[in-house]
């Protein structure tokens, strides 16, 4: 599972 979650 590859999930990209951008964090500020």
Curated annotation (Swiss-Prot):
> Subcellular location, in the record's words?
Secreted
Please indicate if the UniProt record lists Secreted as a keyword.
Answer: yes
Protein name (record):
Leukopyrokinin
Residues annotated with Leucine amide modification? 8
**Family (UniProt):** Belongs to the pyrokinin family.
Other notes: An analog without the N-terminal PCA residue was synthesized and found to exhibit greater activity (144%) than the parent neuropeptide. The portion of the sequence of LPK most critical for the myotropic properties is limited to the pentapeptide fragment FTPRL.
Protein task? Mediates visceral muscle contractile activity (myotropic activity).
Name any Gene Ontology BP term.
neuropeptide signaling pathway
* Position of the signal peptide: none
Residue(s) carrying Pyrrolidone carboxylic acid? 1
Tell me the keywords, alphabetical order.
Amidation, Neuropeptide, Pyrrolidone carboxylic acid, Secreted
Gene Ontology CC: one annotated term: extracellular region
């Amino acid at each position: 599972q590859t999930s990209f979650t951008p964090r500020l």
